[in-house]
Amino acid sequence: MRTTTLGTHGPQVGVIGLGAMGMSFAYDMATPRDESTSVSVVHQALDLGVTLIDTADVYGPYTNEELVGRALAGHRDRAVIATKVGMECIDPTGGPGGSPLVKPNGRPEHVRAAIDASLRRLGTDHVDLYQLHRVDPEVPIEETWGALAEAVAAGKARHIGLSEVSVEQIKRAQAIHPVTTVQSEFSLWTRDVQAEVLPYCEQHGIGLLPYSPLGRGFLAGRFASFDELPQNDQRRRLPRFQQDNLQANLDIATKVSEVAERIGATPAQVALAWLVAQGPHVVPIPGTKTPKYLADNAGAADVQLSPADLADLDAIPAPTGARY
């Protein structure tokens, strides 16, 4: 697979990463998880050159890192492990639909304890990228970021990054310690970061990690109606997936499919290739627990979109419905 680096100073990774969240959390929770398949998907990812594996302590809650750790046992040197801190579970079933209820926690003492817990769960002595999951509105970002910087100084993290932040917040963090990456929702139907965050990151050599790069499966053509969403799936609670909005948004998926058919690729590959084309250090992290979807996603690294293809995709209208 083609490679790039996480920003100008970060580690080398494949241009397509892997988000591990869905192996333990959030999507299709009524279906039992098959850990052996998830482990094999991680191994398959490494074989395909998908080396950036993204998780978080709160996913599961607190089981996704363990799964990633088991999958990478004996393969640690082949992977670039990215995990996150800054959210904590306060009730495993207290959220909507019985989902975990989580809230931000950016207190430095929480970060200091959390990195050690993450390393234990992951079975490693360091993570390659330690990310602030969300900024805690009750804690100055300088204090939280300083605690992440301590993890670097202690050799527990090689690099640190941010998630879902504004340019102002990036600047405040940069004044304390270099920012290697910013993770944001970014796809053909969520393009907010193009206004300010993406240009700033490119100007300052910061990598951008788009999560939900396939619009939570929608851009890949996985479903065309609300009723096709699995029961106990968090997408059933999101505005864009409500039936009226979903029907209005089908034109977006259709346009992606038209480009895919024209160039002999899949819709998922087109959506991911569009993201890779947005900058030299943009590394999408699509999530999957299915071998065939992983292979499909990895194949996006070989898809070259022409200027005409990019223009057609850029012209796709904004979606109907808010993100949350």
Please report, for each region that a protein language model flagged, where it lies by residue.
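Structural motif
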Residues: Q44, L48, R121-L122, G155, ...
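Short, acidic/polar
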Residues: T31-A45, P104-L122, S166-I170
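Alpha-helix N-cap and loop-to-helix initiation/capping positions
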Residues: A30-T37, T63, L67, S99-H110, ...
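Beta/alpha (TIM)-barrel catalytic core signal, keyed to glycine-rich beta->alpha loops juxtaposed to Asp/Glu
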Residues: T3, V135-P137, I141-Y324
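Conserved beta-strand positions
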Residues: L18-A20, T55, L129-L132, L162, ...
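N-terminal binding-site loop/beta-alpha segment at the start of enzyme catalytic domains
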Residues: M1-V80, Q231, A322
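Active-site groove signature of glycoside hydrolases
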Residues: L119-D136
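N-terminal small/glycine-rich loop or linker at the start of catalytic domains
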Residues: H9-A30, A82-V102, H126, Q131
